[in-house]
């Protein structure tokens, strides 16, 4: 999570407003991208052990739940009042995706046995675990750590021209017990729409200054405003000196004045908006232009 001195921090998100195609999820290993925070040297953790490749698909109804369908999802006892460090229990669905105890990406608990993250965070070469229930990325005394049984990367995940379908689901080895610090977030139905200028929130343990090598120890949060598609595309095109449409259907942009946005290590975390006291995940941290620029 970065707080820079630029006039506007810009981040592209992958929308979760449509169910995944019902097809076989065979052998989908994500290519390496620069966004996840994988080791202190900036590369993947050399100690991570191999993991079996992604397997057949998860239940599609994970993507059709809505706040009204469950009294358990999307509720937190704490109100948002601002700040940098997230208060304990403010984001009970926040997950740290890890290899050998090292944080690489964020994630979100969507049921007792499923975690949602970014596709580019997952490789078939590694075993993963998830840590939840504590705002500290390192302290495991008060948190729950569960091994990942299977990983499913979206079958149409691609980095050609632009990043598409950057989603993955992690099936846990056993269900977690819900507590005040461990709760699932709500996932919107397909026809759900996010309006421009909606104030939403992103959280993560990513780098604070862009050039730092280590993740933030304490979970960070920052509010972001949803940007209209056309405006976002123009800004991205200008930044990349390109005339191509980089922002495509299935993406949404978030921005914050004064250069506050996500950074390496925040990938896979969620963009969540509050509706009628219920938190709904509308996007996943996928990619951006620098950190806090």
UniProtKB/Swiss-Prot annotation:
Domain Peptidase S1: residue ranges: 80-293
Signal peptide: 1-26
UniProt keyword list: Cell membrane, Cytoplasm, Differentiation, Disulfide bond, Glycoprotein, GPI-anchor, Hydrolase, Lipoprotein, Membrane, Protease, Serine protease, Signal, Spermatogenesis
A family per Pfam: Trypsin
Enzyme class: hydrolase
Membrane topology summary: Lipid-anchor; GPI-anchor
InterPro entries: Peptidase_S1_PA, Peptidase_S1_PA_chymotrypsin, Peptidase_S1A, Trypsin_dom, TRYPSIN_HIS
SMART domains from the UniProt entry: Tryp_SPc (SM00020)
Role according to the record: Plays a role in spermatogenesis. Involved in germ cell survival during meiosis.
UniProt protein name: Putative serine protease 42
Gene from which the chain derives: PRSS42P
């Amino acid at each position: 999570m970065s707080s820079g001195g630029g006039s506007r921090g810009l981040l592209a998100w992958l929308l979760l407003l449509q169910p995944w195609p019902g097809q076989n999820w065979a052998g989908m290993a994500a290519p390496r991208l620069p966004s996840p925070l994988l080791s202190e040297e900036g590369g993947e953790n050399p100690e991570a052990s191999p993991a079996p490749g992604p397997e057949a698909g998860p239940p599609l109804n994970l993507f059709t739940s809505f706040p009204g369908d469950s009294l358990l999802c999307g509720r937190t006892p704490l109100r948002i009042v601002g700040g940098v460090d997230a208060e304990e229990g403010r984001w009970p669905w926040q997950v740290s995706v890890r290899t050998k105890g090292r944080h690489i990406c964020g994630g979100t608990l969507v049921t007792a046995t499923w975690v949602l993250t970014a596709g580019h965070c997952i490789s078939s070469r590694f075993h993963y675990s998830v840590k939840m229930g504590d705002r500290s990325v390192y302290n495991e005394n008060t948190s729950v750590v569960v091994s990942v049984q299977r990983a499913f990367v979206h079958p149409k995940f691609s980095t050609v021209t632009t990043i598409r379908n950057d989603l993955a689901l992690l099936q846990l080895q056993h269900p977690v017990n819900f507590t005040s610090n461990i709760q699932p977030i709500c996932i919107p139905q397909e026809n759900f729409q996010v309006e421009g200028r909606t104030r939403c929130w992103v959280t993560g343990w990513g780098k604070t200054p862009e050039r730092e090598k280590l993740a933030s120890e304490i979970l960070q949060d920052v509010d972001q405003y949803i940007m209209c598609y056309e405006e976002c595309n123009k800004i991205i095109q200008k930044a990349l000196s390109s005339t191509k449409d980089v922002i495509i259907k299935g993406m949404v942009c978030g921005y914050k004045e004064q250069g506050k946005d996500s950074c390496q290590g925040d990938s896979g975390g969620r963009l969540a908006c509050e509706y009628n006291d219920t938190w709904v995940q509308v996007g996943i941290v996928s990619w951006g232009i620098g950190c806090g620029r």
